Amino acid sequence: MIRAHLATFPPRRRLLRKTCDAILPQVDHLFVVLKDYDEVPGFLAKNPKVTAIIPDRDVKDAGKFWFTPAPDDIVFTIDDDIGYPPDYVTRTLAQLNAIGPEGNVVGYQGNIYIGPRGEGQKPWDNYLFHQPAEAVLGASLLGTGTLCARGSSIPPLSEIEPNAGACDIPFCAWLFGRGILPWMLPREGGWLSNDLPRNLKPSSLFQTVARQGHAAYRGLLWSFATRWPHAN
């Protein structure tokens, strides 16, 4: 099964509809976690290709890992603020197969730890999903809004939820512990689009969690980020 996993909340209802319209024709099934919803929207409830639940707690972005795939499934974890083109699944899956789906995961957003540089310069090279990249690159940290992996390379929710809000970090920590390598894929600029409206930016996890720099997930990040055999 080719499946997509998405977590969302009510202020992004319009984005959710747009994302579902883009992804549903490309996958066998879409799994959605609806934080803070009172009921499942009709366009999801009526679609036989959709399984949607309202969780009993705030799992934030860890909701992308709520559902457990079969080991041989192909899983795309997606975000509601990204514009996915019509060839997103076929093109991404072809690149995963070229690299080798056993022991590897792929995506379009990530960070590579470079190490100490000049004064005032950060030790990271950052690659945003909507910007161009010319080659496959080994990542130190891979974003889960544009992730593709076999089901066997998707961790259980229990591994991600303690760091909900920054799920890229526990995801990559879990990969590192199992020798699974994250890779960033080449693409043209604008092939994927950033669809987050300006009025919703203050509610994004980047603003509400990542910029707070909580010590717990910072420590987890540094436990693996400089130690990958294929990056840095």
Report each predicted region and the residues it spans.
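Short, charged/polar "capping" segments at the starts of alpha-helices
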Residues: 12-14, 37-43, 115-116
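Residues at the starts of beta-strands that form the adenosine-phosphate
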Residues: 28-29, 74, 181
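Short beta-strand-to-loop acidic/aromatic patch adjacent to the donor-nucleotide binding site
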Residues: 72-83
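Short beta-alpha junction loops
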Residues: 34-38, 110-113, 188-189
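Short, well-formed alpha-helical segments that are part of the catalytic scaffolds
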Residues: 6-26, 32-34
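C-terminal catalytic/acceptor-binding lobe
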Residues: 1-5, 15, 160-232
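Active-site-proximal specificity loops/subdomain of glycosyltransferases
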Residues: 34-73
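Conserved catalytic core of nucleotide-sugar-dependent glycosyltransferases
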Residues: 83-157
